[in-house]
């Protein structure tokens, strides 16, 4: 499931997620920049599809940018249907995740339904304390496929994903070697693998998390834009893995925004 989703959302030329996708007459889809570069390397403006090797006839260069708008318009409905299909597939694995207050930092407060968390206001020197306030979700998983969504809204700094149980949640070292597989926002969006930057908008508001414990993968989606933004792989599926949520502590005079697990 996870591998197929990634393949559907990736360009066969650059092997990255589609950027301004375009469909050729043979119906294969590529990034616009990738296929334009591929075709323009042939001086008579004829090229074969990189996948099926069918010859693709291309309009004159000055017409290319105009014609691509028409092609993109024709693709819009089918791409939207594909995005909705992927989203519906993910929701077949939807879990009723809530926050486990028994595992929480004392600096967090929760809604009555245990779906929302917020940092308390604090008024002391943060340099003497851990910068993070964390909590686990429930249930935890050791096998199978599981999906949940988190509304991060206006929260300035957050970390989401899974961690093995037990793991040292009081540490600031939230890295895979310590049992954490997460994405985080601290200005830009990053993965916790050597702080690798993720090509996602800093205005990302809702994050979808798909855990395939059998394939040892966790995928992160920009739900509003139906985009896969990152994949962690290679962790041990025999571990008990718990949903993980973390908010940065507040400085003096700051007020915290709410992080919410979507029902």
Swiss-Prot record:
Keywords: Metal-binding, Zinc, Zinc-finger
InterPro entries: B30.2/SPRY (IPR001870), B30.2/SPRY_sf (IPR043136), Butyrophylin_SPRY (IPR003879), ConA-like_dom_sf (IPR013320), PRY (IPR006574), SPRY_dom (IPR003877), TRIM/RBCC (IPR050143), Znf_RING (IPR001841)
GO biological process, one term: regulation of gene expression
A GO molecular-function annotation: zinc ion binding
GO cellular component annotations of the record: cytoplasm
The keyword Metal-binding belongs to this UniProt entry's keyword annotation: yes
PROSITE patterns assigned to the protein according to its UniProt record, in alphabetical order: B302_SPRY (PS50188), ZF_RING_1 (PS00518), ZF_RING_2 (PS50089)
Coiled-coil regions listed: none
Cross-referenced Gene3D superfamilies: 2.60.120.920, Zinc/RING finger domain, C3HC4 (zinc finger)
Keyword set includes Zinc: yes
Domain B30.2/SPRY as annotated: residue spans: 76-263
Pfam families for this protein: PRY (PF13765), SPRY (PF00622), zf-C3HC4_4 (PF15227)
Zinc finger (RING-type): 11-53
PANTHER family: E3 UBIQUITIN-PROTEIN LIGASE TRIM (PTHR24103)
Name of the protein: Ret finger protein-like 4B
